[in-house]
């Protein structure tokens, strides 16, 4: 029987690395706990730079889902809003384009450094859980050849 575990890639921003490093450690540990394989950790300078790395990882047949991890801290301008909004939009577009989950483990916008620290565990573990759940459910859906009159629930 072939291995049914989920192969993940994690794209992590180096900006605010005191936060994202801890997010990465939590994400790797949680993926292992849930039985998934982290095949690639790809570091990018900042959250805004994630899209190109995500795209390259989604092209790979040996990657089932991509988890993104970042922290976009509020500054004196609206720069954090632009970064967070555009990053989220683009990675969602890539997920739909490639038919693979890309989950949003990016803290912000509008958060302080202290608020971001408080959210490390929640954002990293939820992003991993969502990636694994969605990859497994998509795998099950794609196995179904024909839908008959009975309702199918994939969970």
UniProtKB/Swiss-Prot annotation:
Q: Which UniProt keywords apply?
A: Riboflavin biosynthesis, Transferase
Binding sites annotated in the UniProt record for 5-amino-6-(D-ribitylamino)uracil:
15, 47-49, 71-73, 104
One of the GO biological process terms: riboflavin biosynthetic process
Q: Does the keyword Protease apply?
A: no
Pathway assigned to this chain's UniProt record: Cofactor biosynthesis; riboflavin biosynthesis; riboflavin from 2-hydroxy-3-oxobutyl phosphate and 5-amino-6-(D-ribitylamino)uracil: step 1/2
> Do you know which CDD domains this protein is assigned to?
Lumazine_synthase_archaeal (cd09211)
Q: Return the InterPro entries for the record.
A: LS, LS/RS, LS/RS_sf
Show the SUPFAM superfamilies listed in the entry.
Lumazine synthase
Q: Where in the sequence is the active site?
A: 79
Catalytic activity reads:
(2S)-2-hydroxy-3-oxobutyl phosphate + 5-amino-6-(D-ribitylamino)uracil = 6,7-dimethyl-8-(1-D-ribityl)lumazine + phosphate + 2 H2O + H(+)
Under Gene Ontology molecular function, one entry of this record is: 6,7-dimethyl-8-ribityllumazine synthase activity
Q: Which NCBIfam families match?
A: lumazine-synth
What family does the Swiss-Prot or TrEMBL record give for this protein? Belongs to the DMRL synthase family.
Function recorded in the entry: Catalyzes the formation of 6,7-dimethyl-8-ribityllumazine by condensation of 5-amino-6-(D-ribitylamino)uracil with 3,4-dihydroxy-2-butanone 4-phosphate. This is the penultimate step in the biosynthesis of riboflavin.
What protein am I looking at? 6,7-dimethyl-8-ribityllumazine synthase
List the source organism. Answer: Sulfurisphaera tokodaii (strain DSM 16993 / JCM 10545 / NBRC 100140 / 7)
């Amino acid at each position: 029987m072939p291995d049914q575990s989920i192969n993940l890639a994690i794209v992590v921003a180096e900006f605010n690395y005191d936060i994202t490093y801890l997010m990465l450690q939590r994400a790797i540990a949680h993926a292992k706990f849930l039985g998934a394989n982290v095949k690639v950790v790809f570091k990018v300078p900042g959250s805004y730079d994630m899209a190109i790395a995500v795209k390259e990882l989604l092209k790979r047949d040996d990657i089932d889902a991509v988890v993104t991890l970042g922290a976009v801290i509020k500054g004196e301008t609206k720069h954090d809003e632009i970064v967070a909004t555009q990053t989220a939009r683009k990675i969602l577009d890539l997920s739909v384009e490639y038919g693979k989950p890309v989950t949003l483990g990016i803290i912000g916008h509008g958060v302080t450094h202290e608020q971001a620290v408080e959210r490390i565990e929640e954002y990293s573990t939820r992003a991993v859980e969502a990636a694994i759940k969605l990859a497994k459910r998509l795998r099950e859906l794609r196995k179904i050849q024909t839908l008959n009159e009975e309702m199918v629930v994939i969970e």
